[in-house]
Design a protein with these regions (language model features):
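A cross-family "folded-core" feature that marks the main globular domain of proteins
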Residues: 2-171
Length: 171
């Protein structure tokens, strides 16, 4: 998955994730996720989005995975992962946006574990904090985003895991 420039493109909606996300096909008939405020509002399959603007983020999908995204990932987790990626880009510049789906999945499972009182430890948290200090600081921002958006607070161990996602996107 990679990020594309979206300002001057045309997209056909395949399906709506929520008010802030759609799965669409670009001009080359490739599946993408478009995320940004209001991009999915009152959209339905077949709608055309012309020149969505610079505030919309576009992520390329592997061939024929758009339907899986529509069925498998709660859009709130995509939005949260997108917000974390945008924050990481402010700190580091360009990063590999293929972490969107794995990061969204990780956050979803983290919240599921919290809801079910399951604790998972990360024996490498101290090492991650030292070796990847900048990534860890960005991941601490993820804690605030998750708390604000979902009302749950992730542990330091989860911050360590999110740091690894961010580090992978920089490598």
């Amino acid at each position: 998955m990679k990020e594309n420039k979206v300002e001057k493109q045309r997209y056909e909606v395949i399906g709506t994730l929520n008010n802030n996300g759609v799965v669409a096909k670009d001009e080359l008939n490739k599946e993408v996720i478009l995320l940004g405020k209001g991009i999915g509002f009152k959209r339905k399959a077949g709608d055309v989005i012309e020149n969505p603007g610079k505030n919309i983020k576009c992520y390329s999908l592997e061939k024929n995975t758009g339907k899986n995204v529509l069925q498998g990932v709660d859009p709130i987790f995509l939005e949260i992962a997108n917000e974390i990626i945008r924050y990481a880009e402010k700190e580091f510049g360009d990063i590999d946006t293929k972490i969107l789906l794995p990061l969204a999945d990780h956050i979803a499972f983290s919240i599921d574990r919290i809801k079910n009182d399951m604790v998972i430890s990360n024996p490498l948290t101290s090492d991650i904090r030292l070796l990847f200090a900048d990534e860890y600081e960005v991941a601490k921002k993820a804690r605030k985003i998750i708390k604000r958006r979902l009302g749950y607070e992730i542990t330091d161990d989860e911050i360590g895991y999110i740091s690894l996602h961010i580090h992978a996107a920089l490598s």
